[in-house]
């Protein structure tokens, strides 16, 4: 009996779907069947396993779930029930708030945990504001809309929530919050204390597909001599029912005209579909199709996710069994074999995955002072205004992902003092370090430098690109730092070949480059350079012509929003490509609140940490007294722990160490991240540098102090 006479296995299709619909689906021509779907049939599309970013308008948008908690609610208003309403705003206008959702009513108390979670779409390149409004509720099913019933409000930026690295943010409650204070990053000091809120965000469970590949061997043919059929297979998930089992269709392979040793392409299955239970049975049908499109059945086999996870080998070589042939022939063994040749659990990490796991963004700025023609005062003022707007637009977003808000700034294309030699790479602040404190520090350095330098007629951008590339390689542990360099130019660039080489080198660095052309100059050569295919490993550069984004008839915030969206749109994609090329996986999210009450017991190993902010400004002038441990012991001033100030970016910028009454005072800014990234050994080394390693509390030998002239040395550290 030939295979053409063999009937398909007994129909065990899901009872919730139409059998006729599935019959029509399987009897359709192959090319049409793969392009259409049936209601109730979940088909996992066969796509490339190489991680890639979508090309939508907002390619790196992610959904987060926001939850709100009130602590120490101190309002004088009376209420029996209270609700929380969330509004979002992407503008600077107070009348543009749109409602996100409303929580269910909660009984009024000093500490309220709203169990409802608000789903929100996060976009990196946008300034997104969230306003939480807490109001009394008179009707259980309808919150009050009157302004008199509003008890407190709080406004925060979504960037601050994501950039807090613990996905948790603390804010003070206000009676009437405004957008200006939220955008400035400072909270107003009010006479009336209303309490605070804790804003937490969670990322929904992400899709983690599995990649599978099968090869066949000696599969039965329709005709032994004149066989022109193509062989393929279908994957089903087997679900057990009360009456009978059902099959859920998952995937269908391509058809190959090779029965002896077909090698199908790898395909992807969603873990939720194929492995909701590790021992969930997967039934695979091996079939053939002739030139007329008619299909026939060869056999089937069963497997599970847990078994395939062992990988290629003898455990994953399956016999294809045809139940009809097996019942008719006693000598029947199988209708061929199927072998698993690839099985991979794939995790596609997104930009948000890396940010919440601790990756910091750093912003570097390069300003080109050159001009091919003499600049009039009016043109210079326009250039300064556009430069200020562009730096503010881009920097106001990136700064929320920068813990210390320090930005490196460079000058290009000018004669610099004191010798007034030509330079295309100098620090904008004319210091030994290019770091400026905040965006205000960058603009102040630019204004001072503008009065001190003489512009050139042409410039070179490659020196600054190479400098920042080297700086990004030295920024710390791989995967924890990513840099964004913005180059502002209005003149003629003469080193296009060197720029191309610098961009190729930067493709291996954690760096994205934004070249922003300003004014009416012809930037066609730079546009062509940035748009053509690079020899590097990934795309790192984007060109933006600022004039095409500005509209004088619109409000300034609209121009700023347009600049930020255009300039930063591809930065998440660049960062994800770098992480994937470097095989850097995102770590689990850091579950730490970046608040002034940040707890870091790891600063001194094996010592409990106590926080007393009232003692921060009460440092003794002579020495450090420890009455609780050694009542009669006064340590000399040379043993007092003094933070080092000679290293920029070290933890001494955030720490104020004071050993008094057995306590350690720690000052950490809200978005500080360096503490959690430093290993135990590094902190011990840093404590030695600051002099703390010479003391070990609470054991201090008085005889040691007397014999050593006031110095204590413990060999155990």
Swiss-Prot record:
Q: Which residues form the C2 domain?
A: 193-318
Which SUPFAM superfamilies does this UniProt record tie to the protein? vWA-like (SSF53300)
Q: Where are the transmembrane segments?
A: none
The biological process GO terms on file are: cellular response to calcium ion
Question: Which stretches make up the VWFA domain?
Answer: 377-567
Q: Which PROSITE patterns match?
A: C2 (PS50004)
GO molecular function, a single term: calcium-dependent phospholipid binding
GO cellular component annotations of the record: plasma membrane
Q: Indicate the family of this protein.
A: Belongs to the copine family.
What name does this protein carry?
A: Copine family protein 5
Q: Mind giving the lineage of the organism this protein is from?
A: Eukaryota, Metazoa, Ecdysozoa, Nematoda, Chromadorea
- Please name the gene that encodes this protein: cpna-5
């Amino acid at each position: 009996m030939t295979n053409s006479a063999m009937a398909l296995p007994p129909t065990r299709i899901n009872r919730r779907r139409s059998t006729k619909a599935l019959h029509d689906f399987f009897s359709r021509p192959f090319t049409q069947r793969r392009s259409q779907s049936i209601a109730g049939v979940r088909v996992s599309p066969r796509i490339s396993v190489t991680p890639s970013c979508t090309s939508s308008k907002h390619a790196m948008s992610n959904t987060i779930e926001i939850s709100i908690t009130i602590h120490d609610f101190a309002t004088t208003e009376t209420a029996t029930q209270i609700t929380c309403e969330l509004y979002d705003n992407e503008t600077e206008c107070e009348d543009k708030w749109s409602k996100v959702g409303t929580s269910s009513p909660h009984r009024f108390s000093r500490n309220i945990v709203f169990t409802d979670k608000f789903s929100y779409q996060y976009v990196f390149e946008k300034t997104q504001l969230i306003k939480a409004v807490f109001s009394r509720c008179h009707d259980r099913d309808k919150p009050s809309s009157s302004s008199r019933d509003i008890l407190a409000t709080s406004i925060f930026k979504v960037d601050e929530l994501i950039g807090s690295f613990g996905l948790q943010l603390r804010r003070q409650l206000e009676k009437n919050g405004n957008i200006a204070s939220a955008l400035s990053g400072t909270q107003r000091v009010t006479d009336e204390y209303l309490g605070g809120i804790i804003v937490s965000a969670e990322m929904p469970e992400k899709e983690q597909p599995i990649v599978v590949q099968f090869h066949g061997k000696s599969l039965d043919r329709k005709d032994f001599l004149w066989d022109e059929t193509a062989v393929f297979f279908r994957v089903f998930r087997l679900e057990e029912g009360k009456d009978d089992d059902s099959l859920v269709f998952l995937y269908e392979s391509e058809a190959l005209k090779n029965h002896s040793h077909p090698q199908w392409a790898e395909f992807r299955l969603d873990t939720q579909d194929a492995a909701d239970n590790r021992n969930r049975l997967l039934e695979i049908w091996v079939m053939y199709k002739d030139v007329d499109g008619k299909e026939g059945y060869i056999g089937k086999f069963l497997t599970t996710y847990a078994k395939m996870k062992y990988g290629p080998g003898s455990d994953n070589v399956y016999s294809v069994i045809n139940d009809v042939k097996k019942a008719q022939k006693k000598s029947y063994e199988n209708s061929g074999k199927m072998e698993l040749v690839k099985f991979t659990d794939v995790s596609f990490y997104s930009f948000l995955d890396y940010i919440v796991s601790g990756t910091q963004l750093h912003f570097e700025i390069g300003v080109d002072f050159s001009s091919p023609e003499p600049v009039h005062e009016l043109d210079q003022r326009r250039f300064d205004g556009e430069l200020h707007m562009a730096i503010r637009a881009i920097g106001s977003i990136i700064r929320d992902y920068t813990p210390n808000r320090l930005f490196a700034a460079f000058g290009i294309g000018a004669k610099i003092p004191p010798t007034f030699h030509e330079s295309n790479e100098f620090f904008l602040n004319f210091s030994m370090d290019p770091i400026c404190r905040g965006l205000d520090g960058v603009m102040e350095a630019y204004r001072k430098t503008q009065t001190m330098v003489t512009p050139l007629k042409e410039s070179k951008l490659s020196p600054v690109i190479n400098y920042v590339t080297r700086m990004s390689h030295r920024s710390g542990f791989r995967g924890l730092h990513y840099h964004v360099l913005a180059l502002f130019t209005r003149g003629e660039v003469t080193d296009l070949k060197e720029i191309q080489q610098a961009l190729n080198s930067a493709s291996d660095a954690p760096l994205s480059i934004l070249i922003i052309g300003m004014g009416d100059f012809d930037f066609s050569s730079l546009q062509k350079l940035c748009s053509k295919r690079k020899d590097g490993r990934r795309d790192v550069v984007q060109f933006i012509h600022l004039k095409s984004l500005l509209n004088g008839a619109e409000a300034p915030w609209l121009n700023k929003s347009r600049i930020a969206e255009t300039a930063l749109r591809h930065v998440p994609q660049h960062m994800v490509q770098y992480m994937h090329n470097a095989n850097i996986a995102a770590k689990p999210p850091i579950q730490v609140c970046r608040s002034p009450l940040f707890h870091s017991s790891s600063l001194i190993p094996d010592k409990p940490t106590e926080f007393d902010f009232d003692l921060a400004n009460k440092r003794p002038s002579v020495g450090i007294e420890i009455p609780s441990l050694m009542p009669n012991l006064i340590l000399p001033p040379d043993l007092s722990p003094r933070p080092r100030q000679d290293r920029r970016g070290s933890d001494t910028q955030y720490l104020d160490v004071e050993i008094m009454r057995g306590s350690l005072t720690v000052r950490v800014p809200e978005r500080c991240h360096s503490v959690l990234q430093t290993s135990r050994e590094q902190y011990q080394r840093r404590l030695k540098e600051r002099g703390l390693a010479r003391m070990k509390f609470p054991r201090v030998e008085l005889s040691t102090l007397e014999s050593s002239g006031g110095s204590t040395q413990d060999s155990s550290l």
